């Protein structure tokens, strides 16, 4: 986990992408934000980049590769798994089945994507502060 690395945000809604960008700007975190509209674009980037991202934030319902499929592909890829990148879902679809499936794929968090920008900002602030304090095996490489 590279705490100064980019935050990968996979979100097919351009409106939600702008909301995430605005929130990170208001919170004054210096991490680069890399937006992808679907899981296949993000997976291609993660498989080819030399940069180690700080965190992956993903929606679930997206075209091509949905969030669950993306998480599964990352989790099964030994090289990507060793990067120790926290994988978090932010989704409006927080039903019991989706939450259970997410945690069966070893995600590090599942958050309801609030339609209230202040609520979403509060959640993102807490998430960022938590992960900035965490120690991961990759900290020792």
Positions of the model-derived regions?
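CheY-like receiver
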Residues: 124-141
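As written
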Residues: 102-108
């Amino acid at each position: 986990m590279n705490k100064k690395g980019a935050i990968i945000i996979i979100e097919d809604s351009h409106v939600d992408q702008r909301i995430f960008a605005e929130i990170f700007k208001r919170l004054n975190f210096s991490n680069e934000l890399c937006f992808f509209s679907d899981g296949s674009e993000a997976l291609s980037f993660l498989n080819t980049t030399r940069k180690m991202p700080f965190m992956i934030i993903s929606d679930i319902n997206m075209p091509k590769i949905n969030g669950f499929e993306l998480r599964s592909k990352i989790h099964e890829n030994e090289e990507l798994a060793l990067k120790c990148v926290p994988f978090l879902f932010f989704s409006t679809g927080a039903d019991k089945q989706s939450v259970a499936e997410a945690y069966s794929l070893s995600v590090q968090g599942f958050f309801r994507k609030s339609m209230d920008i202040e609520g979403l900002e509060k959640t993102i602030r807490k998430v960022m502060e938590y992960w900035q304090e965490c120690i991961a095996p990759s900290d020792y490489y």
